[in-house]
Amino acid sequence: MAKVSVIVPVYNVEKYLKRCLDSLINQTLSDIDIICINDGSKDSSLQILEQYAQKDSRIVIYNQENSGLSVARNTGLEHASGEYIGFVDSDDWVDLDFYEKLYNSAKNNNADIAVADFIREHPNKKPKRLKLKEEKIYTTPEDKFMICKVHSEGCVWNKIYRTEFIHSINLKFVPKMYYEDRDFTIRSLYFSKKLVTTPNTYYRYFVNPKSIVNKRRNYIQDEHYILVRQQVLQFIKEHNIKVPDGLYKAEIYRYKLFGKTLFTIKESINSKYIFLFGKIQIFKMRLKNNG
């Protein structure tokens, strides 16, 4: 059994895939599985995967019809047999000591989840980073939610998860859903017994202008954006998780700002966008009424 199974969904990323795979096959922690899910790529991504798999037996390829990121990750979860599970998007990359440090941190502290730093790499902007100060254990939902910034980030790729823990709560990604990380993240953080932070190693998130979430938004993405953020706040309230008041105020501001933005662009004139704007206003009122 490998120490970490790394799940890599792949869809039309021929330009960036080698960089991603090179960062994985050269990890200082060599005892890893690299589970690549080819999600119906139409470019040369599959050929690149096959070339790497011929040279490195740790790379396993599963092919499926294009079904989206959530389904691809779920396929990876079905085949993951490592002690821990990690996720890497195929246009991103990781520091070479990334999984060694995460695994040692999780193992030494008997943690269900280990979380690392990340850098958001933008082609034309200064990198944005999450900077963890120290290795520290967190056990309460409130602390885990705040250190992982679930209200603004909620990502799965800068973490590893104990496989047994993920299977014990039957945790999967919601199919056909944009921003699918958020639901997985809040549930894993809430139900985990222990989380440990792992500083000084980075997941490199590449802001790819051609990726799904960075393309010109459509009304489905906008609706999912609203629904996912709503789920976070509802989950916090339903499970009586105490978070700073500023979190709710920040969320209300996001909805208000987002609604105004939708209303100023041409596409917002159609009924679907008006429906979304109405939903934002309704949810904002609910938040105010709930304190």
Spell out what each predicted region is.
Residues 69, 90-196, 206-220:
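Donor-binding/catalytic cores of nucleotide-activated saccharide
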Residues 155, 197, 206-280, 289-291:
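C-terminal subregions of glycosyltransferases and related glycan-biosynthesis enzymes
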Residues 1-26:
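N-proximal low-complexity "stem/linker" segments adjacent to membrane-targeting elements
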Residues 31-40, 60-65, 90:
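Short beta-strand/loop segment that forms part of the nucleotide-sugar
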Residues 18, 43-51, 93, 97:
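Acidic helix N-cap motif at the loop->helix transition within catalytic regions
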Residues 85:
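Short aromatic/hydrophobic "clamp" motif used to bind/position activated sugar donors
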Residues 64-80:
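Glycine-rich, basic loop-to-helix element that forms the pyrophosphate-binding segment
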